[in-house]
Amino acid sequence: MNFKSLLLCTFIGLSSLAQAETVHVATAGSLKTLVDTTGRVIDNLTLTGTVNRSDLRYLRNHVKQLNLKDVTIAEETVGKVLYPDNVMPDSVFIGDKVLANVVLPASIAEIGKCAFKEVRGAAFTVDFSNCKHLQLIRANAFSESSLQEANLAGLTALQLIDAYAFYWTDIKSISLEGCSSLIMLGERAFCNDYFVTSVNLKGCTSLQTVGNRAFLNLAKQSGDAGTLDFSETAIESFDASSLQSTKIKTVIFPATLKTLGDKVLNLSKVTNMKFLGSVPPKVGAQWMMASALKHVKITVPAGAVAAYAAAFKLSGEDAKNLTDTNGATLGIDGVTTPAISAQKRYNMSGQRVGRDYKGLVIVNGKKVVK
């Protein structure tokens, strides 16, 4: 390395260091006296101490990477509006065109309405990993932002993802793994998230309701979000259009399911459905296109084929893809019959025999007396 190159590398290194700042805020509301944002964008800012809504709002459009992990948010009243403590304030970063990464405070219990709506920093990411007390993500919290992923894994206190919370973002993946207190996904919570390729719902054992259009148009651009596995949830109801127009291959419905609302899977690309409940759900109007339903592979619990066929109004040729976990299908006159035509039968001399053969036979490698 020549001398000029060495000087250049040193200059770049010093410039980068100069842009990384750590500031302790001893008194909420005093950030303006500690950080000058006039005509500048800070590459990397870490705050500690106590801040309020005014402090955070002051940073809007002035910071690329913001670490708030060790910050406590204090209550503040602005005009007639009260911004509570331990809540990421409503609309605090709305429309920020610079913010690209934020590490959320470990102490917050709630993310307010529109807090990060329309944040469009390059490849916007949010670190939720420290938010062990987070209970609520309010309406439009991240809607229409350039957010890259919704990784809420391990947030065991989270109870509600409100309406439009992650509406029309750039997220590629959704992980709610281990969100054991999550009860509800609100209306259009993940609607129009076109680029999603995976959804993880493992451990969402308290989830009861998926709201109207919650996953509408999921993966419209990516083309395949894989499997939506609700098997570990306690969902009783999927509201109208909640999975409409989704680009997913497989849906696994829980044993607790009671209702599938109007147009739940209308215009979706589902090719496999598995129902874990022995009693079929009540289905709303056009819950799935009739032309699509008869081509979808449907698996139900043992002995439940007839009940599901009746509930879904499937019969004859249209019911050929409906089977139970034992391989039973809907036979003639609505009688369920095991799918045994493929069984190979041999007598003790090794000769292939038919189903009517009497005596000791070997069926698929096992001895059976007929």
Regions found by a protein language model. Name each.
Residues 2-3, 360-370:
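C-terminal tail/sorting-segment detector
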Residues 5-14:
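Sec-dependent N-terminal signal peptides
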Residues 14-20:
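Sec/Tat signal peptide C-region and signal peptidase I cleavage site
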Residues 20-26, 43-51, 63-86, 97-110, ...:
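Structural signature of tandem-repeat unit edges
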Residues 45, 308, 331-334, 350, ...:
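Terminal processing/anchoring signals of secreted or surface-associated proteins
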Residues 90-92, 112-115, 138-141, 162-165, ...:
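Consensus positions within tandem repeat domains that build extended binding/scaffold surfaces
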Residues 310-331:
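A recurrent domain-boundary module in secreted/ectodomain proteins
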Residues 326-349:
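Residue-level detector of functionally pivotal "anchor" positions at catalytic/ligand-binding pockets or at interdomain
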